[in-house]
């Protein structure tokens, strides 16, 4: 997911996306434990997307505090 796409979403959409990505990450972790042939890089991409979303949410929260 691109940072431009993330910044264009509302806070509610970001929270929903964050919830879904965390759920997906848990599924990937469990699948990796059970099946060694799974794509190991997919989990790291999900983690990076989660970090991007949290960064944007944090920036927006700080903007509100500074205003």
From Swiss-Prot:
Q: Give the UniProt entry's GO cellular component terms.
A: ribonucleoprotein complex; ribosome
Put simply, this protein is called Large ribosomal subunit protein uL29
Instruction: Please name the GO terms of the biological process aspect recorded for this protein, alphabetically.
Output: translation
Write one Gene Ontology MF term.
Answer: structural constituent of ribosome
Tell me the keywords, alphabetical order: Ribonucleoprotein, Ribosomal protein
List the HAMAP family: Ribosomal_uL29 (MF_00374)
Q: Fetch the NCBIfam families from UniProt.
A: L29
